[in-house]
Amino acid sequence: MAGPRTTVEAQAFYRMYHSYADIPDPWDRMRWCRYSLGLLQKDVAAMVGMEEWLYQDLESGAFHRSFTPELADKLAALYGIPVEDILDDYTLFLHRGGGAFLRRYREAKGWNRQQLADHAKVGCTSIRTWENGQKSISHKCFDLLVENLGHDFTAMLHM
């Protein structure tokens, strides 16, 4: 679907969510913003300089590594919303620097790499390569970090 085929489709979406604040998912927030501006997916994609298929995937909840921080910032600016509103936790983590964020988290906790590795239940070598940007953190590893580090990890992510 490139856009609401009818105003009925957009109205049905608006009935599902009474206000923007009610929308829990980033992809539905993007759809809400697009509908409120009366734009098609292809229009939004062209306006921010991304491929139409990528924007369609984003509105379907399929985030990709090709959804760069720069594209996220452009999309948020177009919609006039904070970039955090359109990113899931993993994409927000990447937007905040991935390994660089992990280093900031570790330093805020007062831990060395081995202590972080112990808490996260991953190898110290993984921590080092992630922090140094030698290796990117997969979605699976991010989920492991969230599970093992707990609420304060995601809370810091949203600060």
Which residues does each PLM region occupy?
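Short coil turns linking two alpha-helices in DNA-binding domains
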Residues: L40, E51-L54, T68, P82, ...
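A short, Lys/Arg-rich alpha-helix, primarily the initiator
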Residues: G3-S36, D88-A108
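Short, structured motif recognition centered on aromatic/hydrophobic residues
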Residues: M30, Y55, V83, L102, ...
